[in-house]
From Swiss-Prot:
Subunit structure: V-ATPase is a heteromultimeric enzyme made up of two complexes: the ATP-hydrolytic V1 complex and the proton translocation V0 complex. The V1 complex consists of three catalytic AB heterodimers that form a heterohexamer, three peripheral stalks each consisting of EG heterodimers, one central rotor including subunits D and F, and the regulatory subunits C and H. The proton translocation complex V0 consists of the proton transport subunit a, a ring of proteolipid subunits c9c'', rotary subunit d, subunits e and f, and the accessory subunits VhaAC45 and ATP6AP2.
Annotated NCBIfam families: PRK04196.1, V-ATPase_V1_B
Family: Belongs to the ATPase alpha/beta chains family.
Keyword Transferase: no
Residues given in the record as ATP binding sites: R384
CDD domains assigned to the protein according to its UniProt record, in alphabetical order: ATP-synt_V_A-type_beta_C, ATP-synt_V_A-type_beta_N, V_A-ATPase_B
Name the record gives this protein: V-type proton ATPase subunit B
Functional summary from the UniProt entry: Non-catalytic subunit of the V1 complex of vacuolar(H+)-ATPase (V-ATPase), a multisubunit enzyme composed of a peripheral complex (V1) that hydrolyzes ATP and a membrane integral complex (V0) that translocates protons. V-ATPase is responsible for acidifying and maintaining the pH of intracellular compartments and in some cell types, is targeted to the plasma membrane, where it is responsible for acidifying the extracellular environment. Essential for the proper assembly and activity of V-ATPase.
Tree of life domain: Eukaryota
Pfam families xrefs: ATP-synt_ab, ATP-synt_ab_N, ATP-synt_VA_C
GO biological process, one term: ATP metabolic process
Gene: VHA55
GO cellular component: a single term: proton-transporting V-type ATPase, V1 domain
Keywords noted in UniProt: ATP-binding, Hydrogen ion transport, Ion transport, Nucleotide-binding, Transport
Length: 494
């Protein structure tokens, strides 16, 4: 039978336990900084330093900074300082080893708040009253207890909903480049995302209380941060949004922990508060460059284009923190945004990201130059989980066939357009001219839509059918006869 203690006995026991632990693991303060290299501080004569241990640094002027032990070699310790190393004086800096890993306070009160890249509130609000302190590396999810994502999220964007459907619990990045409207697309998805409302079928968890957005910005400019903040405030969803902002003028090293803090908050909201969380991470290219900077400071052997050899593993520790877990109603859907340097999809950052994530949404500069919004090029875009999230009972039974046929016609239209540039329009067959007409109308009527235009998946499918009616039935070889008989003769509603 458990022994019951009075309050005073319990307090005494607690003091004994703390002092016992303190004696075996004393929190020593060192003044042995032997060097500073980029974002790293090297300490000598350290007793029992531990890997990933958090170190508190007190500068000569009394400023407090925190860092993490990256490397341990005998009595030497290499500490990465999250707030940067500017102003650190080797003689007068005090370093205290805390004996604990990096944890972040989490609470449902984080919604509606704005934090910096280190997780400290910057919205002039009170500190977070923590319900728990969680390790920012997250809990490993047993693959056996993961649930396959099967509920489609309707984004209201035709090029995504019909051609590259996103399932709840999926991780799908936006591959973009400098100067393209990836922020506007992400904001539109945040505004419009919800479950597909099927007539006659009640969707219980579609109401707003159950939906949250966690937004993490790494190395973005003030304009981008202001754009998202203003957008969330204007559409009234700010009380369901948690923002982590590491701006371009903030320390580079801080970018390493910003996405992990955001995902820890998202995991708490999804698995403890059972909310459906949409995580937007921008810009992953800045994150990878911060990783390269730390790797160079540690003098590690560089990999492709100077990025560290472990970048694939490191990116996976972020992207894999999405999904659904058995026994929990919440989910985490991840939409990382990355800007491809020089529009190069073979660059290591998009290349490795594409291997880990379940598809990608490709934002195209040529479409953007033709004033098409959203400039989503459907041919290199892909959603690997689309097949399980669409069809009868989820969207409509013609969904996958319409999608396949639109893909086929658009691809042939692109080939015809290239051929026309060589041989001229007079040399094209009547069929070729139909494909050219389809190509123009597909980009103008289907891909292109308004910034605030929220099309249901059924409206998008109807627009798809409207375009397919350009062709005679015999040319629509990707659609079964039964589907054609039911949907092809329909009068257009638009």
């Amino acid at each position: 039978m458990a022994k019951t203690l009075t309050a005073s006995q319990a307090a005494k026991e607690h003091v004994l336990a703390v002092s016992r632990d303190f004696i075996s693991q004393p929190r020593l303060i060192y003044k042995t900084v032997s060097g500073v290299n980029g974002p790293l501080v090297i300490l000598d004569d350290v007793k029992f330093p531990k890997f990933s241990e958090i170190v508190q640094l007190r500068l000569a002027d009394g400023t407090l900074r925190s860092g993490q032990v990256l490397e341990v070699s005998g009595t030497k310790a290499v500490v990465q300082v999250f707030e940067g190393t500017s102003g650190i004086d080797a003689k007068n800096t005090l370093c205290e080893f805390t004996g604990d890993i990096l944890r972040t306070p989490v609470s449902e009160d984080m919604l509606g708040r704005v934090f910096n890249g280190s997780g400290k509130p910057i919205d002039k609000g009170p500190p977070i009253l923590a319900e728990d302190f969680l390790d920012i590396q997250g809990q490993p999810i047993n693959p056996w207890s993961r649930i396959y994502p099967e509920e489609m999220i309707q984004t209201g964007i035709s090029a995504i909903d019909v051609m590259n459907s996103i399932a709840r619990g999926q991780k799908i990045p936006i591959f973009s480049a400098a100067g393209l409207p990836h922020n506007e697309i992400a904001a539109q998805i945040c505004r419009q995302a919800g479950l597909v409302k099927i007539p006659g079928k009640s969707v219980l968890d579609d109401h707003e209380d159950n939906f949250a957005i966690v937004f993490a910005a790494m190395g973005v400019n003030m304009e981008t941060a202001r754009f998202f903040k203003q957008d969330f405030e204007e559409n009234g969803s700010m009380e369901n949004v948690c923002l982590f902002l590491n701006l371009a003028n903030d320390p580079t090293i801080e970018r390493i922990i910003t996405p992990r803090l955001a995902l820890t908050a998202a995991e708490f909201l999804a698995y403890q508060c059972e909310k459906h969380v949409l995580v937007i991470l921008t810009d992953m290219s800045s994150y990878a460059e911060a990783l390269r900077e730390v790797s160079a400071a540690r003098e590690e052997v560089p990999g492709r284009r100077g990025f560290p050899g472990y970048m694939y593993t490191d990116l996976a520790t972020i992207y894999e923190r999405a999904g659904r877990v058995e026994g929990r109603n919440g989910s985490i859907t991840q939409i990382p945004i990355l800007t491809m340097p020089n529009d190069d999809i073979t660059h290591p950052i998009p290349d490795l990201t594409g291997y880990i994530t379940e598809g990608q949404i490709y934002v195209d500069r040529q479409l953007h130059n033709r004033q098409i919004y959203p400039p989503v090029n459907v041919l290199p875009s892909l959603s690997r989980l689309m097949k399980s999230a669409i069809g009868e009972g989820m969207t409509r039974k013609d969904h996958s066939d319409v999608s396949n046929q639109l893909y086929a016609c658009y691809a042939i239209g692109k080939d015809v357009q290239a051929m026309k540039a060589v041989v001229g329009e007079e040399a094209l067959t009547p069929d070729d001219l139909l494909y050219l007409e389809f190509l123009t109308k597909f980009e103008k009527n289907f891909i292109s839509q308004g910034n605030y235009e929220n099309r249901t998946v059924f409206e998008s499918l109807d627009i798809g059918w409207q375009l397919l009616r350009i062709f005679p039935k015999e040319m629509l070889k990707r659609i079964p006869a039964s589907i054609l008989a039911e949907f092809y003769p329909r009068d257009s509603r638009h």
